[in-house]
Amino acid sequence: MMLFDLNQQAAELPEAWRSAVLGRVGAANIKVLRMDARSIADEVHDYSEGLLVISGHLRLQVAGEEVVVRAGQLYQAAAGVPHRVLPGSEGTLVIVDLPEDQVPSLG
């Protein structure tokens, strides 16, 4: 078992928006990164992604709409759906990669 100070882990990373894998839970990667105010171009993944803001806020654009994820909130970016980071995000972000074959069917 390990205890992580997520804000400290993010602060010690050499570069913003470059994640470090802290570990795995089942098939999912648990990653941490430090956000800064710059924008990030559209991303599309073949897996779902959980975006958990630990401190600060994350500004996303998804399907033409702005989504603001605040500290303590989790946003799930669906597989195959383009999303981009808008300027002005800051703080600590935890990313949980959910491979498509690991996402339970709701139907």
Segments (PLM) and residue ranges:
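A short, N-terminal "cap"/entry segment at the start of jelly-roll beta-barrel domains
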Residues: 1-33, 39
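Residues that act as N-cap/strand-start positions at coil-to-secondary-structure junctions
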Residues: 16-17, 45, 54, 77-79
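Short histidine-centered beta-strand/loop micro-motifs
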Residues: 21, 33, 40-45, 62, ...
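Structural motif
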Residues: 29, 50, 57-59, 66, ...
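Short, conserved beta-strand element in jelly-roll/cupin
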Residues: 35, 44-60
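A cytosolic small-molecule/anion-sensing beta-strand core signal
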Residues: 54-55, 70-71, 89
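Short acidic-glycine-tyrosine-enriched beta hairpin
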Residues: 64-79
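Ligand-binding loop in jelly-roll beta-barrel domains
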Residues: 79-106
